[in-house]
């Protein structure tokens, strides 16, 4: 498809949602919009933020706990309606695999750029606990600084839940750091932040998985600098895993029927584009201020009404 026909197709889709003269959109279905929740704060808060916007527009909403990788198949099959935080590095392959089968569409990209990587809290660098950081080669000689009670004298990297990345980090550690390092998997994102608090209190260094945008952007977090990522460098893609993570996009996905069943909600969803500060602030309401995910969403919606209400009007 050339650029001209692509523009024609895009215009045709837009005209099915609203005419340039401001014609009222077809009424959204009363069928609930099903929004998934996963296991990190910004995603759950944003689920309730988006659900709150849909409800303000008069829609019915349901929330379901969903597997972070399997959710794209659920969207394709129509069991889930949308996904609002599709992180390129972790979920890109599952996203595109479901799209290739049919039934899932790309609903746009957030303004925020992402990085999913291991690193250390800023105070580890400030206290020079491992000289040479953030260069990954510094870890080769200071593994003992990152040893914990369950690491057998080896340096420990605390990864997120294994369902997020599979063997990506064990493969990388084996390829670049060797036998003096071990990867342990946290049960949840909350376990990562609890380890940060405990490590600082105990005066020990810690090396954990993290991502940006996140609430830690404000507190300070230093990502390890590995050899540059290139397509196919990971072992799971046929490479040797001697590479770091790519900087990537943050997309939204939807079931292909969503634009027809809920044209107004889909138009609003396609317009939603949150930046790093906005996403980090959603997470901070939970991870720093201690609100529940639902209360955090309510607070965020109240504080940012001008931002989200602009996404819900008719027109281009």
Put a short name on every predicted segment.
Residues 41-60, 172:
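Short, polar/charged alpha-helical segment
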Residues 103-158:
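A conserved helix-loop-strand patch within extracytoplasmic ligand-binding domains
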Residues 116-128, 247-261, 284-285:
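A bilobed periplasmic-binding-protein/Venus flytrap-type ligand-binding module shared by bacterial periplasmic
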Residues 266-316:
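C-terminal functional modules
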